[in-house]
């Protein structure tokens, strides 16, 4: 056999290896054994004398159809990617100058990227070396190609790409000219539905009926590009979540880092956005110039307890010093110094302990490759280190993401046992917020959540005037289940969403005294609400409460 093996080409050996791996996987599955895939790949590759291991994509592609259902979920690369039930596709708009250069004369001191920087082909606030930027540059910033490529890539890795959420990155999208924005959003919807549209409204109409559903679009923006006209535009795009760059709650820090807007603007934009039904995710930067540990901790206490802020989600980006920025000059001349790594882990651990149970921490650091960073975060796994530090301190992180059923299952192999409805009320941004969730309180696992808001009097959308409650988010966690099928072991489509909606309608009618309830719904999920008696009014799905 050894002689024969030498005559075979590399490709043939590779095929034999893959076939052998799949055979062993099927046997293990039939015997109900757990397999260490990496060990299996190494062993089998060595057996056939290969220097390189077969790629996961090739193994997944070669699984015979009758075994796909059993094997592909086990082979899935990076299960966290769809653990929350949705495949996230990040796309970037073309590089453009930062909008506030016109009136502050310069960009923020810590900001890399943009058309004038060392990294000239990158968008504002990105270096062009992050995975998303590289994909965007490869597609020449074409939204259609970025979407198609990423969806295909996730499919090859064994994920179910049935529900897609877009994140529009690359500086302030809303500062771009209107015709470019329309072209961009139109192409995102068209890439999923396969239709070629002439305008956004048409694209949205076809996207509603697409097989791959767009369940939401997230747009990154600044508080000064989050005014009424911007919010109305974003509603027409099918956008459901905003990421607003706050960075700091201190007026002097916002001024000295050259943000070009005040903290008051932040509070106002939060208020307007929540009254239009958006979910608000704030970007926060600890470790900015003239802060210090005390002020940094205090600002997060303020951020979560002051009703003028209280976001629905947060991305935590510890400050990085990157060449070509104003901060780099301060750092080189010794006028700015980053926290030592252990202090930073301490700070992040403290911040995570402050996060209320209705807030989701999406990220704990930027996706910037280490060689570009002159000073700042030294570890790639800051969240893990912070969670380990919290264990030592005896505190725990109770944000939405840590308690999600899908993520708990991947990390701790824990499944919920006794699920009950839990309700939390709080006041934020001039409105009454109710956070409803189905949880297993014993093990602290979250299965589904709903955010309900009694709109304040100042709501500017005509659909939401005069005693209307709005559901800003409905999400049942757990692995993606295609929209039409039911899998009894997974938590989507088990009716939790329906139960949450019924409770929300009851609260809106009996406690808020509202005559109508509205839902800000992703374009692809509108049919779900149609089934339970809602109809489209403007960008919202609404229902009269008798």
Curated annotation (Swiss-Prot):
GO terms for biological process: regulation of transcription by RNA polymerase II; tRNA wobble base 5-methoxycarbonylmethyl-2-thiouridinylation; tRNA wobble uridine modification. Its EC number is 2.3.1.311. Acetyl-CoA binds at residues 163, 473-476, 496-498, 529. It is found in: Cytoplasm; Nucleus. It is an enzyme of class 2 (transferase). Keywords: 4Fe-4S, Acyltransferase, Cytoplasm, Iron, Iron-sulfur, Metal-binding, Nucleus, RNA-binding, S-adenosyl-L-methionine, Transferase, tRNA processing, tRNA-binding. Pathway: tRNA modification; 5-methoxycarbonylmethyl-2-thiouridine-tRNA biosynthesis. The keyword Repeat does not apply. Its main location: cytoplasm. Binds 1 [4Fe-4S] cluster. The cluster is coordinated with 3 cysteines and an exchangeable S-adenosyl-L-methionine. GO terms for molecular function: 4 iron, 4 sulfur cluster binding; metal ion binding; phosphorylase kinase regulator activity; tRNA binding; tRNA uridine(34) acetyltransferase activity. Its cofactor is [4Fe-4S] cluster. CDD domains: Radical_SAM. Residues 395-546 form the N-acetyltransferase domain. Component of the elongator complex. This is Elongator complex protein 3. It comes from Gallus gallus. The gene is ELP3.
